[in-house]
């Protein structure tokens, strides 16, 4: 029998089951399982992020009932699979239910016979059960509201990769499930600290942090992709095998990823591909122009869903209104795929091993920036401002000439930490294979950029330049222009 007591025994059990990271999520599950009342728990997050793995391993697969939806499967076939699962758990034979209402009635009859203090039911890939004209959601709502919510000790866990569906239909539902979800648990991709633990403990891969950072910049913190790495070949050979060999698994993953997450997946792909073409991202107006579409609530919904599924991030520019917000591609796997895999059919199967240093470094510069933006918490920790109210934004300006002839350079600042103590950390994110060297020209660039920002924004806050770079800063006559340095090692902190 599972023990849910928080303490040393539970930690040891978690290590045995090889749950990497997820301490907060496991602690929350423990607390929920120690509650007497019935609970409806919704887990959501990007596909391949490890939602199913977490639930199965936390509970050691000891469920009183488990069922997973089947992708693009008609309702009658889903109901037949549900019948098979019920037969497996009860040891009895059942006819296939005629609809979901009957299926849940059969489940209710089975669960009501279980005499246990705690009953655990797990529905995985719930969105896939909600096929057209199946009335699944209304049947599920009735099952929970009319009976399951009254069964003390029941822990009903629902999970889905289609994050937008989970948020709209379950977590934010305005109908039968309004306010019924007891707990929502968002499963985020691993951070660098967790990627390092995963590679060492799960895969036995003892790469240095520079190599781990490169892996993160390609795969993001997605455990499913990281689990494909082979410790017996080099880093470059791993990338070739996974992306560029004939039938490489991550070459075909991209299309399935979108089809499994979104209806009308072509529209979602078109948006991602449009945004991917511009490193700084696109505004809503620019996306409409790129896709040649007019004003549409559908496009706004697509963008919202892509943000909720961790493909895009929406960020505001300093001092500008919401309508000027920019959408930027932040899913690192999609970024790498768009840059190197699209249109690569028939190319060298050892493409990554043979690619030029200039091409690789150009990509790495931008990918490193995105990796940094996924670790703002670690950057704030290094700066010692975790307890300071901080807004995260960006700022950009095209080259301008004033009426008096004064020329101002074009400026692009990818990360501003605007603090409540009237300090703005102006962050420079620079990928380097050694200590970063501030030249005279670069020092002048930083000075002109800060002056331009202060002049046009009219800010009275102090501007502190922060350098985020792989190996730190080489001291020289110009390094004093950097207020604080954050290294890759700092990004690996918890």
Regions found by a protein language model. Give the residues of each.
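Phosphate-binding site recognition
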Residues: 1-354, 358, 465
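A cross-kingdom feature that marks ATP-driven nucleic-acid transaction machinery
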Residues: 318, 325-494
């Amino acid at each position: 029998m599972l023990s849910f007591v928080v303490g040393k025994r539970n930690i040891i059990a978690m290590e045995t089951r090889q749950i990497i990271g997820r301490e907060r999520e496991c602690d929350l599950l423990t607390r929920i399982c120690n509650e007497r009342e019935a609970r409806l728990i919704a887990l959501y997050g990007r596909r391949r992020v490890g939602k199913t793995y977490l639930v199965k391993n936390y509970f050691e697969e000891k469920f009183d009932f488990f069922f997973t939806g089947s992708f693009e499967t008609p309702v009658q076939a889903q109901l037949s699979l549900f019948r098979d699962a019920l037969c497996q758990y009860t040891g009895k034979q059942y006819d296939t239910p005629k609809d979901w209402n009957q299926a849940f009635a059969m489940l209710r009859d089975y669960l009501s016979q279980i005499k246990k203090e705690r009953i655990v039911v797990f529905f995985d890939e719930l969105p896939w059960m909600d096929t057209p004209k199946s009335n699944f959601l209304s049947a599920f709502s009735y099952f929970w509201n009319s009976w399951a919510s009254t069964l003390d000790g029941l822990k009903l866990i629902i999970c889905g990769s289609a994050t937008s569906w989970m948020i709209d239909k379950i977590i934010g539902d305005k109908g039968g499930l309004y306010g019924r979800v007891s707990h929502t648990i968002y499963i985020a991709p691993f951070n660098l600290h967790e990627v390092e633990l995963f590679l060492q403990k799960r895969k036995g891969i003892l790469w240095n942090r520079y190599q781990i950072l490169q892996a993160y910049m390609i795969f993001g913190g997605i455990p499913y992709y990281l689990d494909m790495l082979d410790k017996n070949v080099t880093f470059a050979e791993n990338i070739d095998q996974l992306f560029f060999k004939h039938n490489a698994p991550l070459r075909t993953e991209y299309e399935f990823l979108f089809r499994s997450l979104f209806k009308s997946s072509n529209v979602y792909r078109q948006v991602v591909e449009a945004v991917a073409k511009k490193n700084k991202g696109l505004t809503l107006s620019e996306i409409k122009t790129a896709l040649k579409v007019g004003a549409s609530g559908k496009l706004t919904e697509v963008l919202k869903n892509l943000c909720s599924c961790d493909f895009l991030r929406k960020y505001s520019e300093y001092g500008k209104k919401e309508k000027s917000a920019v959408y930027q591609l932040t899913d690192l796997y999609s970024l790498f795929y768009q840059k190197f895999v699209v249109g690569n059919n028939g190319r060298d199967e050892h493409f990554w091993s043979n690619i030029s240093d200039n091409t690789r470094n150009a990509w790495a510069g931008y990918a490193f920036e995105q990796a940094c933006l996924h670790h703002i918490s670690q950057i704030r920790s290094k700066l010692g401002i975790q307890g300071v109210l901080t807004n995260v934004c960006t700022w950009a300006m095209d080259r301008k000439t004033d009426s008096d002839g004064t020329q101002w350079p074009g400026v692009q600042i990818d990360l501003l930490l605007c603090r409540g103590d009237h300090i703005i950390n102006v962050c420079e994110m620079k990928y380097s294979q050694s200590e970063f060297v501030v030249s005279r020209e670069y020092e002048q660039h930083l000075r002109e950029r800060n002056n331009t920002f202060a002049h046009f924004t009219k800010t009275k806050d102090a501007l502190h330049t922060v350098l985020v770079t792989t190996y730190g800063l080489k001291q020289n006559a110009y390094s004093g222009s950097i207020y604080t340095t954050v290294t890759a090692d700092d990004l690996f902190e918890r």
